[in-house]
């Protein structure tokens, strides 16, 4: 199956800072990673948005 695009949105301010490619089959849980948010100016949890 082809890769699909998804975004990682900051849990604090909601801005979509990163884009990723995920496998075609959707999982029930969404990816959560700690990344730097340029709008907040600190490391925050970023969650996958579809």
From Swiss-Prot:
Gene Ontology process terms (BP): translation
Identify one Gene Ontology CC term for this UniProt entry: cytoplasm
UniProt entry tagged with the keyword Ribonucleoprotein: yes
GO MF term (any one)? structural constituent of ribosome
Q: Does the keyword Ribosomal protein apply?
A: yes
Which InterPro entries does the record match to this protein? Ribosomal_bL33, Ribosomal_bL33_sf, Ribosomal_zn-bd
* UniProt keywords, alphabetically: Ribonucleoprotein, Ribosomal protein
Q: Which HAMAP family match?
A: Ribosomal_bL33 (MF_00294)
Q: Which family does it belong to?
A: Belongs to the bacterial ribosomal protein bL33 family.
Q: What is this protein called?
A: Large ribosomal subunit protein bL33B
Species this chain originates from: Streptococcus pneumoniae serotype 4 (strain ATCC BAA-334 / TIGR4)
The gene that this protein is the product of is: rpmG2
């Amino acid at each position: 199956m082809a890769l699909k695009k998804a975004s990682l949105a900051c849990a604090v301010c909601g801005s979509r800072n990163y884009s990723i490619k995920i496998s075609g089959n959707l999982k029930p849980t969404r990816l959560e990673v700690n990344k730097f948010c340029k709008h907040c100016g600190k490391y925050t949890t970023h969650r996958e948005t579809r």
